[in-house]
Amino acid sequence: MNLHEYQAKELLASYGLPVQGGILAHNGEEAAAAYDKLGGKFAVVKAQVHAGGRGKAGGVKVVKSREEAKEVAESLIGTNLVTYQTDANGQPVNSVLVCEDMYPVQTELYLGAVVDRSTRRVTFMASTEGGVEIEKVAAETPEKIFKVTVDPLVGLQPCQAREVAFQLGLKDKQINEFVKLMTGAYKAFVENDFALFEVNPLAVRENGALACVDGKIGIDSNALYRLPKIAELRDKSQENERELKASEFDLNYVALEGNIGCMVNGAGLAMATMDIIKLKGGQPANFLDVGGGATKDRVVEAFKLILEDKSVKGVLINIFGGIVRCDMIAEAIVAAVKEINVDVPVVVRLEGNNAELGAKILNESGLKLTSADGLNDAAEKIVAAVNA
């Protein structure tokens, strides 16, 4: 689960991090009032969406008057912002953050942290190249990224934070200020089950003070059950409608840009299914894992979910019956096809537990369902049907 910038800054500020001041506005009048309250020579109006690349997409604007703040806010709120991290439809802008005047600054730094899967520990990354995408820095000048791996038994040590401060070129009081900032960030990371933390840029102001000009936080969704206050911050308007609906039925769904819907049990088999569709010249429209313990109701909902995507021209159902029985899946498929007006070809491949019984149910249903003998055959049949 992602947080908006204003939510991330509020959370980080509660852990003692120095963040850029800002006021949330939901309309032009509120943005103008926020500009007056901040009282600087200029302000920055930032669209609040769950996506990076806002500046290049026109979602971050410098304003020099209350009238301009109102005008920019009204031009953003109610629209969809399309960035390199969104799909073609973009993300809806429901509010803007009017931020205080902090420039010019001495320099812009970068500080971020993730859970490193290779070490299975929290790893901090810092760089002197702030204000640009860290991916670009990693690709072009990887030597400018400094990494610190934290031992979970002892936590982040002050000496580790000081070493990073030295590498960033900080001096005197800035070093202690940075140690406090990085320590607070680690505490926030652990206590709130972050999956991602990023401050870009971390500005060194003209007076030498540090300030988090931006803030990006991703929360581990698996931990939301123990984070009720964080869960309340969820903005469902920023999530794909079908992915949101899928989560309500414990389905793992990711929308893609193809035209062949996929329903599979097991993430590995789902990825293999998408691979072979591509190999045969097709384009998968989604990743959909109904899980090893799929129930009849979940399969029906999964089928509905796939067909809600108007770009879907055919459906491939690939089920390996291990825990789940193929006859139960077959009954669910028949029920879903009868309930929904299915006007696209459906190819079904069943293997494993009660596969023969499942195939019998499909064949005797009287519905236009095509059985496949193996994954290769299934992929060839659905690609041919879609291209027919």
From Swiss-Prot:
The keyword Transcription regulation does not apply. Keywords: ATP-binding, Ligase, Magnesium, Metal-binding, Nucleotide-binding, Tricarboxylic acid cycle. It catalyses: succinate + ATP + CoA = succinyl-CoA + ADP + phosphate; GTP + succinate + CoA = succinyl-CoA + GDP + phosphate. Substrate binds at N265, G322, I323, V324. Its cofactor is Mg(2+). InterPro entries: ATP-grasp, ATP-grasp_succ-CoA_synth-type, ATP_grasp_subdomain_1, Succ-CoA_synthase_bsu_CS, SUCC_ACL_C, Succ_CoA_ligase-like_bsu, Succinyl-CoA_synth-like. Pfam families: ATP-grasp_2, Ligase_CoA. Signal peptide: none annotated. Residues 9-245 form the ATP-grasp domain. ATP binds at K46, G53, R54, G55, E100, Y103, E108. Disulfide bonds: none annotated. It comes from the Bacteria. Mg(2+) binds at N200, D214. The keyword Ligase applies. Binds 1 Mg(2+) ion per subunit. GO terms for biological process: succinyl-CoA metabolic process; tricarboxylic acid cycle. Its EC number is 6.2.1.5. GO terms for molecular function: ATP binding; magnesium ion binding; succinate-CoA ligase (ADP-forming) activity; succinate-CoA ligase (GDP-forming) activity. Succinyl-CoA synthetase functions in the citric acid cycle (TCA), coupling the hydrolysis of succinyl-CoA to the synthesis of either ATP or GTP and thus represents the only step of substrate-level phosphorylation in the TCA. The beta subunit provides nucleotide specificity of the enzyme and binds the substrate succinate, while the binding sites for coenzyme A and phosphate are found in the alpha subunit. HAMAP family: Succ_CoA_beta. Heterotetramer of two alpha and two beta subunits. This is Succinate--CoA ligase [ADP-forming] subunit beta. It comes from Neisseria meningitidis serogroup A / serotype 4A (strain DSM 15465 / Z2491). The gene is sucC.
